């Protein structure tokens, strides 16, 4: 039996239409905390200072995570190389990179705590074009490259030692002209 061309009823359709559908944001559990992230407004900048002391003192704030909490820990992740920090440590590399995270008893408390975190930046040169970013003289975004041990096919990647290009992977299999003639 084929359902192509037939109307399909959605089991959740009526609840969505009535506004009765439950979403993750609608769920409240005992002891649940709300987490909000403070994000960079700079495309590329050195982080000179992060002061979360006022946010930590706000009633209802349970925890504030900043770069200071990551010292001495494995703070990087990534599928091929671990080059993505859990949150910004020395600098930010894009608008929206997480600088700090706040866990609080209520959403509005977490949002208020974000406003109390002070961050001082030193803007750095930024590149807004893919081809410009690939040039050798472009600012390098990921200077540290810790090779990941968990990527199953990483042996096929030729990791680059410098620059913004992580890997070059050359595919050369078969005869293109023959492939087109046989298609």
Whereabouts are the PLM-identified features?
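Flexible, low-hydrophobicity surface segments
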Residues: 1-176, 183
């Amino acid at each position: 039996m084929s359902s192509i061309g037939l109307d399909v009823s959605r089991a959740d359709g009526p609840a969505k239409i009535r506004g009765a559908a439950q979403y993750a944001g609608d769920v409240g559990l005992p002891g649940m905390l709300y987490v909000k992230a403070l994000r960079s407004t700079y495309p590329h900048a050195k982080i000179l200072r992060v002061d979360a002391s006022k946010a930590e003192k706000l009633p209802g704030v349970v925890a504030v995570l900043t770069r200071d909490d990551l010292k001495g820990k494995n703070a990087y992740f990534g599928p091929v190389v671990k080059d993505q920090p859990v949150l910004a440590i020395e600098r930010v590399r894009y608008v929206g990179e997480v600088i700090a995270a706040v866990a609080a008893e209520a959403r509005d408390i977490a949002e208020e705590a974000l406003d109390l975190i002070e961050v001082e930046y030193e803007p750095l040169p930024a590149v807004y074009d893919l081809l410009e970013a690939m040039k050798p003289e472009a600012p390098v975004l990921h200077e540290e490259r810790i090779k990941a041990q968990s990527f199953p096919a990483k042996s096929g990647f030729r990791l680059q030692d410098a620059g913004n290009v992580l890997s070059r992977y050359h595919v050369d299999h078969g005869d293109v002209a023959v492939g087109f003639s046989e298609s």
